Amino acid sequence: MRIAVAALACLMLAPSGAGAVQPAKTRVQVSARIVRLVAGPIVAEVRRTPLRLRLLARGKTLVREQSDGGLFYERSGTVHELGAVRDARWVDGGVQLDVDTDEGSIATVTVRFLTRRTLEVELVPPDPAGVNAVGERLRSPSNEHIYGLTERLRDSPVIRPGVLDFSQDDINPPEVGSLDRRGETVEMRIIPTFSVYAPFYQSSLGYGLSVGGTTFGLFDLAKSDPSTVSVRFETASAPEARRLVFDLFAGPDYATILDEYTNLVGRPIVPPDWAFQHWRWRDELRIGTPAMLDGVPVNADLADDVLMYEQLGIPAGVYHFDRPVVVGNYGFARWEWDTTRMPNPDAMLASLARRGYHTTIWSGAWMCGSGPGDDGTEAQALGYIAPGPVGPPNCADVGGTSFILDVTNPGAQDWWRDKVADFVRRYGIQGIKLDRGEEHIPSQATDIWADGRTGREVLNAYPTLQARIHHDALASVFGDDFVLISRPSYTGTPHWSIFWGGDIAGSTSFGLGHGTDLGLRSAIISQQRAAFLGVPIWGSDTGGYYQFTDREVFARWIEFSTFSGVMEIGGHGTHAPWNMPTQPNYDQEMIDIYRRYTTLRATLQPYIVTAAREAAGGMPIVRPMPFADRRDHKLDDLWDQFLFGPDLLVAPIWKIGQRERTVYLPRGKWRSYWDPSKVLKGRRTVAVSVPLDMIPVFVRDGAKVRGP
């Protein structure tokens, strides 16, 4: 037994999609009772009998394993525990430990600092080929708050497994959820359409935890045992997938944890300045009699948007072309404009460009169409379709066949990247709204993908692979002057894309039911959930993807989206104040609100762009209130207000009929953005009036932010 080892170690890693991790100078001390790893003020201690780990910062415990059991693995349904440390060997940045197990054989546990604040722990069970799950248990005091994991408010059953894999709560949102996830179980298996996930959470105790890999897993956040946070993940066939690897990040502040996390998994992409203008789009630009724009017949819905913007004095921004605008099956069979729907595309795009619009278009890794020249036909002939039942390629929301691209196949990646690049190059379209990527993905253990992984490994990996293909297509044409916005995300996806929050409800039951304000409520929470996840730039379909039926919901959502990472206005049905689904149809009050806040978005663009530059280190544009002062416990779960950048405090309204609310001001001094004459001291609650055209916004005293 080695009981006296001291060493200095340096480790330099370059994870996929990440920059080089900074070297960690680590002092390792091994005694008969404890193994200590010291990286400046951060210390990892491993008790030897039985093995128990804890992480400390300046002598204060941030997190520790449960006393009655920490690391574990499962074989044939039986949970096996680790015992005493037999041997300790120095490795770069830390130690490798031989550990007894209750099977009588030896497991290997490696503990090492990747940076001065990132500790990696790896468990390799004995005979790993026979292991079906691995996990960890951590002590959770009752005052701990846990943030992150998903943007979705909570896990709920899907509507019809294998057919409509949508969470029931997404379609009919309940009034549940907040920032704090404590007391929940959260499954790590991406379900559409609120599909920003990561096996990563942050704790109010001052640490973060991220689990490596893409296999399915479960976080039990002190639900089964009020004193324990546990994680359990499946293993897979590859040797590297038959072990548990997780990283602990020492804060204590949330910004530091995000910096460490994104340094490991990949720095988030920051799009060009123009992407922070407001976006205009429709779920469908309808086929019909064209209208004239600059003397050329174009799609009438598009002409209506452009000409009404000019007539009403609404600033130009980003115009997005959603599916269907190209030809064939599902409106997406070939990268070729459907000129029945979209006549004179060159002239149309020139008219938009003259007015200052940038343009984006819909895409997904769906191989549609079985006719000559269709992408589905070509992909199938090349062997690029994902595993599963074979039939003629047919894209459909329900009942489609053979249409998912095998994004693990390098040939398929290159082929699709080049097709996308050719189209955006030809038409100068500088962005893609990347849909799906988590829907209808073959995800069974019997689904073997091109790279040898099973569907249970690929489902969570698909968003990143899909995003990288489209990122590379755009980058090959435009350098860094493009935007990619996606719906699904898992570890590393934000390195390639920014995000929007899925098919959010302005009305229930896929838009067939009654109107609701709970979709807006969920968007307010989801944006902040994403912020804790290392997803710094996020937006939502203003008014709801499923058509709003109450004008107040649209008004309040416009106000909220002005202070979101992305302000995008569109969805199913009409989202135009001059053509409302409510009365009056031509709604002057709504026109004034729409114009006021799209203009304000343009006014605030320099401030937003400056805040966005911090996103490269993981700092979100929208910052949940715990970011403001982690010592002020009134902020721990205050979800209905947030910081927008460093100096604006925003308190959105989501309830229909609400005309007043309270706002809690954190420490410091604050001024009303709308009436800056009065300075208010922080750590107090103020009551504010909120007429329909007003959202409460406060400015940090002394900050320089352009006024309304």
Feature annotation, model-predicted:
Residues P41, L123, F200, Y309, ...:
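Conserved, mostly hydrophobic/aromatic
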Residues M308, S351, R355-G356, D472-D480, ...:
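Carbohydrate-binding surfaces of carbohydrate-active enzymes
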Residues A4-A14:
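Bacterial N-terminal signal peptides
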Residues T150-L153, V158, V163-D169, E175-V176, ...:
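Aromatic- and carboxylate-enriched substrate-binding clefts and catalytic-loop regions
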Residues I34-A275, W279-A300, V306-Q311, S689-G707:
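Catalytic and substrate-binding clefts that recognize carbohydrates or anionic sugar/phosphate headgroups
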Residues L51, P128, L205-Y207, T214-F216, ...:
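Short, glycine-/Ser/Thr-/acidic-enriched flexible segments
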Residues A24-K25, T108-T110, V186-R189, V196-A198, ...:
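Generic recognition of flexible, low-complexity loop/linker segments
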Residues A18-A20:
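Boundary at the C-terminal end of the N-terminal hydrophobic targeting segment
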